[in-house]
Amino acid sequence: MVEQLGDRAIRFARPASSARAIVRAVRAWPGVTDVVVARDTVAAYFAGAPEVDDAHIAALAALPDDPTPPREHVLRAIYDGDDLDELARTTGVDVARVHAAATYTVDQMGFLPGFAYLVGLDPRLAVPRRATPRARLAAGSIAIAAGYTAVYPLDSPGGWHLIGRVVDARMFGPEGSLLSIGDRVRFTC
């Protein structure tokens, strides 16, 4: 089902195809200026009135994976976050070691410019959001919550558990976002 978002955008349920393939296909639609992939939905923004029908949406469900290899990022991390010790007690694991052992994929972008929701978090680190969000997290903070990990691209409020910080990388700036949907990310210490 396609939902109008004003006169220049639509939103529809996210098909099972890979996020990279969806973005590539939707960007090829006539008049598309931006595509936002969320966990359950996709929004497409247009220069004028959307010229999309149900056939466009249906075709997304059968997309092959994007053949272009994903970009790989290795982010240097210092695991010294405010919640690290508490999470180690709660989960019973060495949070830094387990977090750094995984390879993550950018599944969606949102919340803030350059905020990448990374999937691939070890299930032992799957914790809910904090009961009380913090008023300010520093740009570069590495955090986990609700089955995701992320690096805060800007100073902002946040309700995720802080486990460390990225050094030598700027997640968002005048040149845009360092990460894009489908990119792969590893953390090293």
Indicate residue ranges for each PLM-predicted region:
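Glycine-rich active-site loops that engage anionic ligands at enzyme catalytic sites
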Residues: 1-189
